[in-house]
Amino acid sequence: MSEIKVGENESLDNAIKRFKRQCARSGVLSEYRKREHYEKPSVKKKKKSEAAKRKKRNF
């Protein structure tokens, strides 16, 4: 869980921006989206191989 301590002279908007940035860096939202629905192991394997193909093609 991401935790932000708001400084004395820091505005709430800045604290929210820092929190969102920290969540994005730690991958909380992407992990949530990935686990939102059950994914069969065969589908996971297929997605992983397709991602590897895309990555190889881009290099």
UniProtKB/Swiss-Prot annotation:
UniProt keyword annotation of Ribosomal protein present: yes
Any Gene Ontology CC annotation: ribonucleoprotein complex
Extent of the signal sequence: none
GO biological process, one term: translation
Keywords noted in UniProt: Ribonucleoprotein, Ribosomal protein
Family: Belongs to the bacterial ribosomal protein bS21 family.
NCBIfam families from the UniProt entry: S21p
UniProt name for this protein: Small ribosomal subunit protein bS21
Species the sequence originates in: Finegoldia magna (strain ATCC 29328 / DSM 20472 / WAL 2508)
Name of the coding gene: rpsU
